[in-house]
Design a protein with these regions (language model features):
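Conserved nucleotide-ligand handling architecture
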Residues: 1-19, 23-24
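A residue-level signal for beta-strand positions that form part of recognition/binding surfaces
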Residues: 14-17, 33, 63, 97
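Intrinsically disordered, low-complexity, positively charged segments
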Residues: 17-53
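Short, glycine/acidic-enriched capping/hinge loops at junctions between secondary-structure elements
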Residues: 29-34, 76-78, 131
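Phosphate-centric recognition/catalysis
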Residues: 44-123
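Conserved small/polar residues in nucleotide/adenosyl-binding loops
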Residues: 129, 133-135
């Protein structure tokens, strides 16, 4: 079973979110926990098993993951792509979930007040230096 946490985030009722850890999961060997990345050399079947467990646990259809590029690239998530090369993504499609993977960078989850749009950001120093986030 994948370990996950809820944070105290005041979001509209139609927004679901969670934070998982690598503490448990279906991965093997040096990736023996809940690895969701095909970028590190793990058997893709184990990664797929971890992703499918998340989908089942939360009743999700499509999850779009970021292949973090340490850039200021922002893309719209869609069903056509399971992985996008970017450091921020968003969607207005209620059937798509956005996922950000981090190690030593900061994951940021965003929505607007009505919950019409969701997004996530991989906030590393390179992306921040390139003005990935504008406030």
């Amino acid at each position: 079973m994948i370990t996950e946490y809820k944070i105290n985030w005041a979001v509209p009722g139609n927004i679901g979110y969670f934070i998982s850890t690598s503490e448990t999961g279906n991965s093997k060997g040096k990736y023996k926990h809940a690895n969701f990345s095909n970028q590190v050399g793990e058997d893709s079947k184990n990664v797929e098993s971890n992703i499918n467990e998340l989908k089942t646990l939360h009743g999700l259809n499509d999850i779009t993951f970021m292949n973090q590029t340490h850039s200021n690239t922002v893309l719209e998530a869609s069903r056509e792509y399971a992985h996008l090369d970017c450091d921020a993504m968003f969607t207005e499609d209620k059937t798509i979930s956005c996922a950000v993977l981090t190690a030593d960078c900061i994951p940021i989850l965003v929505t607007e007040s009505s919950g019409r749009m969701i997004g996530c950001i991989h906030a590393g120093w390179r992306g921040l230096q390139l003005s990935l986030i504008h406030i």
